[in-house]
């Protein structure tokens, strides 16, 4: 029972709250964020394959607008855009709304990372479970997890970086050798963290 209640909560939390991410409308800056992503993607394709795709949207400060989250959400896009709840929309609207689910799934993942951080610090499984439930149900974070393609991904990756920092610190305190994989992980996720919110 010590862990069962947490996973029962998590199951219903994903099912029920996940639906709200589909029902949340598009905010005022999501189209801009999406267009910056498309232009940056075109820029990469132009560089790699000598193409001449449109990158005009990056004029001015647009190219410094972080797009790291979209690398992650692109993996889910082909599947999420086919959900029946999105069938009435055009393809671009489907893609933007599908990112809401990607944000929400990343938020749930951040909850699991949060639980691991608590266990690293306190080593009390029940306390970690309850803390994670309160974290996931915190109204401000939960509300933003339905649509915010900037702050929630940044928070989630920041927690992952924090987990690896604490893990490495604990190993060093115990005078043990830190495995190279931890440095690779924290380097990768720190780079991703900076790419999500470069400025603003």
Regions found by a protein language model. Name each.
Residues 71-102, 124, 139-140:
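Juxtamembrane segments of multi-pass membrane glycosylation machinery
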